[in-house]
Structures are given as C-alpha cells and as structure tokens.
Swiss-Prot record:
Name of the molecule in the record: Protein Wnt-5a
PANTHER family: PROTEIN WNT-5A, WNT RELATED
Pfam family, one: wnt
Residues making up the signal peptide according to the UniProt record: none
Top-level lineage group: Eukaryota
Any single Gene Ontology cellular-component annotation: extracellular space
GO BP annotations, alphabetical order: canonical Wnt signaling pathway; cell fate commitment; neuron differentiation
Length: 116
C-alpha cells in the first residue's frame, strides 16, 4: 500500500490596514525623478540611494491638499473643525497643516428625557 500527501497553496491578501500602512510608508519615502536630456529618468537629488524596483518614484509633485484647489477638486482644510486631542487624521496638528487653529468652547443644553 502507498501513502500520498497533499499540499494546497493559495495567495491571500494581507490585512487591509497592513496594506494601507505599507503603501503610506512607500508614498512618504518616494523618490523625486526628472527626465534628463536623453529622455531617461534620473533622480532629482542624487544624495539619496537609487530607488529599487520595489520603491515608488514620481515626476510631478502632489498637490497641496491643505489649500483649496479647484483644478484638483481639493477643498483645502481652512475652516474645518478639528479635534485638538487627536493624533489622527482629524487632529488639529495634521489637518491644519502647521498654520495654527482657533479654539472655542460650546455649551449645549439638551433635554435628556430623564425619569426620576
């Protein structure tokens, strides 16, 4: 009698958060490139390491999303409400792009429909 072993391999996407974090890290460390006289891509700043095939590169600068720009559809961040204590995307430090922000307190009175 003979024995047989069976192996099954498959590809599976990584956790969405991990993929997003990896892409953001690559975006933040992308290398600026330009076309030289021969039409070949070369680094704008040669002090940095040459990008590998796994790195992101770019030719055009990303728009400044802090400033309103109708051609890109960006509404900017001026006048938006931010969360002073948050370190996330809704936090004032990130959303206000270093321009500072106004602070205010609001007192609201609401009926609570409490029963005693």
């Amino acid at each position: 009698s003979g024995s047989c072993s069976l192996k099954t391999c498959w590809l599976q996407l990584a956790d969405f958060r991990k993929v997003g974090n990896a892409l953001k890290e690559k975006y933040d460390s992308a290398t600026a490139m330009k076309l030289n006289g021969r039409g070949k891509l070369v680094q704008v700043n040669s002090r940095f390491n040459t990008p590998t095939t796994l790195d992101l590169v770019y030719v055009d600068q990303s728009p400044d999303y802090c400033v309103r720009n109708e051609s890109t559809g960006s509404l900017g961040t001026q006048g938006r409400l931010c969360n002073k204590t948050s370190e996330g995307m809704d936090g004032c430090a990130l959303m206000c792009c270093g321009r500072g922000y106004d602070q205010f307190k609001t007192v609201r009175t609401e009926r609570c429909h409490c029963k005693f």
